[in-house]
Amino acid sequence: MPQIGLVSAVNLRVQGSSAYLWSSRSSSLGTESRDGCLQRNSLCFAGSESMGHKLKIRTPHATTRRLVKDLGPLKVVCIDYPRPELDNTVNYLEAAFLSSTFRASPRPTKPLEIVIAGAGLGGLSTAKYLADAGHKPILLEARDVLGGKVAAWKDDDGDWYETGLHIFFGAYPNIQNLFGELGINDRLQWKEHSMIFAMPSKPGEFSRFDFSEALPAPLNGILAILKNNEMLTWPEKVKFAIGLLPAMLGGQSYVEAQDGISVKDWMRKQGVPDRVTDEVFIAMSKALNFINPDELSMQCILIALNRFLQEKHGSKMAFLDGNPPERLCMPIVEHIESKGGQVRLNSRIKKIELNEDGSVKSFILSDGSAIEGDAFVFAAPVDIFKLLLPEDWKEIPYFQKLEKLVGVPVINVHIWFDRKLKNTYDHLLFSRSSLLSVYADMSVTCKEYYNPNQSMLELVFAPAEEWISRSDSEIIDATMKELATLFPDEISADQSKAKILKYHVVKTPRSVYKTVPGCEPCRPLQRSPIEGFYLAGDYTKQKYLASMEGAVLSGKLCAQAIVQDYELLVGRSQKKLSEASVV
């Protein structure tokens, strides 16, 4: 049964048996306050322009921008799909049980004050579940925006630009539980169960892998591969299937053993033709870790395939219905604060101050203030942690292993065009270009970004190592050349067709850790050898690697370790107080 907001017949395309009709300013996004900030359960930042640094770059064509937004409430049609049945899968139930242990744990007689550095998904998750267990997290974020790798900013036109193109899979059980626990399942816009790849040899054309709703996993995935005859030949499919047999039969132990070999080398070792790697796994490698298959560890691919093929809805994708800081991070913040926790922006860690015994005394902020607590968590990226690693810890093997973990550069590009592009889908698209990874027309896929007259393409530019230091204009020029192949009838590199109204280029020199062969043994457990000090983040040890799901799970595991260490941490605090009173 369709859910109806303000409805018109704009671009109505039926893509499935269930259609969701919505308005970009209907109740699904909240009501509009006097200051223009949409409000629903107070989940918005007022004056969101202050959430990040402006990267706005005008072009001569920008004078026609914002026409639609000035016409009043938009009447919008969006074809989304119902939330899939995820709640009874083994992984979802396992994640739900872990969440329940925090709510069910005995209320502490003395709640711990835990200082957490970094308000990305790892830090937010750690704080959320510690608050659920009755403790008082103090979450410190260096910047003026929440989200870490899912941060976003609003420009002077009211348009958002993001750190990355974020996709929520059915195979993300801890993320899906988190949305349910916060009561925001309706903020995920589920798309058709397909994977859509551009065809470089046929400019402007796409090839699809469509997953049947009638079949269980892994049959729906196998059928999707067998039905696609445009990317792989039958002999290639057979050789690929034979090559995958050891992974399918060997289970998790086999998957973990493939950490030391690259995707390309593994494929050749298994007798899989190079064309399979070129046709499928270049795109998949770039989407998973922003690097090519000659660098990526095969373990990463096998983990993804395992999740996608073992769960019926594992590879089904959803977009968040708006910007991540307001639509995802703020509900977590409000949950934390409702239980007595704190979240502080503009609180950059300058130094980890130690006690004489080598344990953490406080986090020193850039303004000179010291934040003390009963326990400390560093949930910022591994590259930042290594810069702040105390000298006394550098010879400890646990910390020495972190040298192998290095963030990978990535660039996120947003381009607003003067017209609606036709050669696109309401979905994530794999570009299969040499410079671009995945992209989406966010004016179609996302409620908050909807525009019936003008497209906004958000594109992941990867691998980005050779481009991260180049100018924004060079990156845009290179992107337009790639788009001319994807949209041959609508885009040309010289803008003689669709014209750029404006663009934003967001560079992240060190994003998720680069999952090259040999990284797995270097990933740290959340509980460090330093009593009272813990790590969280997608680079820490958890089974979902470098992803939003991995970050959320790392936070839960970190919170679990702290709850388990409650007696030890209380004892440390009492000893500290008694020593202070003697002095």
From Swiss-Prot:
EC number: 1.3.5.5
Topology of the protein relative to the lipid bilayer: Peripheral membrane protein
Main location: plastid
Named cofactor requirement(s): FAD
Subcellular location: Plastid, Chloroplast; Plastid, Chromoplast; Membrane
Residues reported to bind substrate: R307, A546
Entry keywords, A to Z: Carotenoid biosynthesis, Chloroplast, Chromoplast, FAD, Flavoprotein, Membrane, Oxidoreductase, Plastid, Transit peptide
Lipid metabolism as UniProt keyword: no
Protein family per UniProt: Belongs to the carotenoid/retinoid oxidoreductase family.
Name this polypeptide is given: 15-cis-phytoene desaturase, chloroplastic/chromoplastic
